[in-house]
Design a protein with these regions (language model features):
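Bacterial Sec-dependent N-terminal signal peptides
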Residues: 1-24
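Intrinsically disordered, low-complexity terminal tails/loops enriched in metal-binding residues
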Residues: 20-160
Length: 160
C-alpha cells in the first residue's frame, strides 16, 4: 500500500514538473513573438527597411515554432500572412502598409493570450488611422518614422 502511494506521488510530481516545463517553454515562445514584433516596429521607426525585413524573418521563424495548442493555426497563419510581405521587401512604404495589419492581429492576440507579464501599450496614429503595440509609453511612430516620430497617443494598456 505504501509503495503504491509512493509511486502515485512520484508520478504526480513528474507530471507536474513536465507540465510546468511545457508552460514555461510556451510562455517563452509567446514572449519571443512579442519581442520580434517590437523589433520590426523599432526598425520601421528608424526607417530601416533592410532591418525590418530581417526582423520580420525572425518573427516568422518564431511564429512557426509555436504550438497550435497555444495559438490557433488560423491566428498564426494571419500573423504569417502579414509578416511575410515585410520580410520579402526592403521598401519601407510597403512594409509599413503590412505592419498595420500585423499590429491589429498582434493586438487581438495580446488581448486573448498572455504574451508577457509586462504592460503592452497600444498606440494610435490619427494621420495613418492605424494602431501599433509598444513596450514603452513614449510615442515613436513606426508609420512615419522621423517625419512624424511623436504623432499618436496611447489608447489602451494591455496586461495592466
Amino acid at each position: 500500500m505504501k509503495k503504491s502511494i509512493l509511486v502515485i506521488a512520484l508520478l504526480a510530481t513528474v507530471f507536474v514538473q513536465k507540465t510546468f516545463a511545457q508552460d514555461s517553454t510556451q510562455q517563452h515562445q509567446l514572449s519571443q513573438l512579442l519581442t520580434q514584433y517590437y523589433n520590426i516596429k523599432d526598425a520601421l521607426v528608424a526607417g530601416n527597411g533592410n532591418l525590418a525585413s530581417i526582423k520580420a524573418e525572425e518573427f516568422i521563424k518564431t511564429a512557426n515554432s509555436i504550438d497550435y495548442k497555444v495559438i490557433s493555426e488560423g491566428n498564426i497563419n494571419a500573423l504569417l500572412k502579414d509578416a511575410t510581405p515585410i520580410s520579402e521587401t526592403k521598401d519601407i512604404k510597403v512594409q509599413r502598409e503590412h505592419f498595420s495589419n500585423l499590429s491589429n492581429n498582434m493586438a487581438s492576440l495580446a488581448k486573448s493570450v498572455k504574451l508577457t507579464t509586462e504592460p503592452i501599450y497600444q498606440a494610435y496614429c490619427p494621420m495613418k488611422k492605424a494602431n501599433w503595440l509598444s513596450n514603452d509609453k513614449a510615442i515613436k511612430n513606426p508609420y512615419y518614422g522621423s517625419a512624424m516620430l511623436t504623432c499618436g497617443k496611447v489608447v489602451e494598456t494591455i496586461n495592466q
